[in-house]
Amino acid sequence: MKSPEALDAALQEIPAGCCVIVPLKIEGGALLYQSQVKGAVASGACKDATLTIREIAESIQSHQLSAIAKLSLLDDAYYPTYDTTAGFLLEDGYSRWLDNKPEKGGKPWMSPFSDSAAAYLQALTAEIMQAGFQNILCTDLDYPHFYDTDLELLGSPVQSKQNRAEGLIRVLNGVHQTASQQGGGAMYTFSLYDALNRDAEALQPVMLNTPSAVVYIDPNSFRDSFWHNNQKISMSGLSMQEKLQVLMPIAQELCGDMHLIPCFRERSFRQQEQTQAEAWLRENGYTQYMFK
């Protein structure tokens, strides 16, 4: 999104009536639009952006497309460098945690326990929604890798599984509440493979206010067998469509009452397999799905 002309050329390739997912906050915390949020400007998060959020939204709307903003929530080094209270602090209350030694390029991460971090994400959400985006697709709602020594220095908030989950859910629900005030909402994203390996820490549908979940599914990740609900499920020898028939009900179960939008890894499918998969999805009532 370096210029209005480049954006317009890209949008012309998309059929009218489709939905466009636009990455606006990427891993590392950089913004791909000129923000007016004080923390975004002061931290340098949008220093390389050229287009305003309204220019992006209006260009999408002019092509009769719906706009969804994709935001990397917590993988952010810009804002907690500017405001240290937005990052992880050690138990002493002022020393900040970095993901490596400073001389090796160590950087901070946004903490889900920080009021400042939550306020920053909600301010960005409000700015984006007010420009004309319909929904917020939330990614990177997770923690950096902590070594045992890190956990000791950071203390109970990151040691307790329940505290960890509640911190992530608080951030997501805050973004959703802000988006819903503008007539939209936030969508939770998680990998089915991660969820089955207990790595999707925020996946507690009863506590989540988000109405929809985008679930990343790569059938090729399930080559042998896996456990679910104390049952060993074998995937060996199954066709792509047979794998789909096994995995989709599990994904729906994990989503609870949230509306499931499956997102499949396109490179895992041959063309015929994708055609068959799309037909099966439609036959089974899945009108919203993605291959990417």
Predicted features along the sequence, with ranges:
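Aromatic-lined carbohydrate-binding/catalytic grooves of carbohydrate-active enzymes
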Residues: 17-50, 152
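Aromatic-lined carbohydrate-recognition surfaces of secreted/lumenal glycan-active proteins
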Residues: 66-75, 137-140, 162-201, 252-271
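Substrate-binding cleft of secreted/luminal carbohydrate-active enzymes
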Residues: 210-292
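The substrate-binding groove and active-site-proximal loops of carbohydrate-active enzymes
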Residues: 1, 37-50, 104-119, 157-164, ...
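Active-site groove signature of glycoside hydrolases
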Residues: 19-27, 109-113, 117, 121-150
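Catalytic domains of carbohydrate-active enzymes, especially glycoside hydrolases
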Residues: 5-32, 127-138, 208-216, 283-288
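Aromatic- and acidic-residue-enriched segments that line the glycan-binding/catalytic groove
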Residues: 34-42, 76-101, 144-159
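Active-site-adjacent "subsite" loops/lids of carbohydrate-active enzymes
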Residues: 1, 74-126
